[in-house]
From Swiss-Prot:
Gene responsible for this protein: NS
HAMAP family xrefs: INFV_NEP
GO cellular component: host cell nucleus; virion component
Subcellular location: Virion; Host nucleus
Protein's UniProt name: Nuclear export protein
Protein source organism: Influenza B virus (strain B/Yamagata/1/1973)
Claim: Transport is one of the keywords in the record: yes
Keyword field contains Ligase: no
Taxon lineage: Viruses, Riboviria, Orthornavirae, Negarnaviricota, Polyploviricotina
Length: 122
């Protein structure tokens, strides 16, 4: 069964098994997601300049990498939301879900901008 799973799915399963359902562990996972989001946001701020200042092949690669990174992080947040739905609700987990949904909304907005850049630049 593991042969058919992607690396992301395997990592998620491992984290899910290691996490259990404790609130503390849930917060650790959420902090990890927020950290990854902040790193993406820093790269995102320089994204328009990267796209404008490179040649065609570099633009395509930049757009592909950013799109892939946006997708992977949004998938991870989706998985986090699904994980929280399986855990007994408490105020900390509900707060994490609200933050997850907010991050997901921002990622979708970023994805829309990437699509506009890719149409303009390619």
């Amino acid at each position: 069964m593991a042969d058919n799973m992607t690396t992301t799915q395997i990592e998620w399963r491992m984290k899910k098994m290691a996490i259990g359902s404790s609130t503390h562990s849930s917060s650790v996972l959420m902090k990890d997601i927020q950290s990854q989001f902040e790193q993406l946001k820093l790269r995102w701020e320089s994204y328009p300049n990267l796209v404008k200042s490179t040649d065609y092949h570099q633009r395509r690669e930049t757009i592909r990498l950013v799109t892939e990174e946006l997708y992977l992080l949004s998938k991870r947040i989706d998985d986090n939301i699904l994980f929280h739905k399986t855990v007994i609700a408490n105020s900390s987990i509900i707060a994490d879900m609200i933050v997850s949904l907010s991050l997901l909304e921002t990622l979708y907005e970023m994805k829309d901008v990437v699509e506009v850049y890719s149409r303009q630049c390619l």
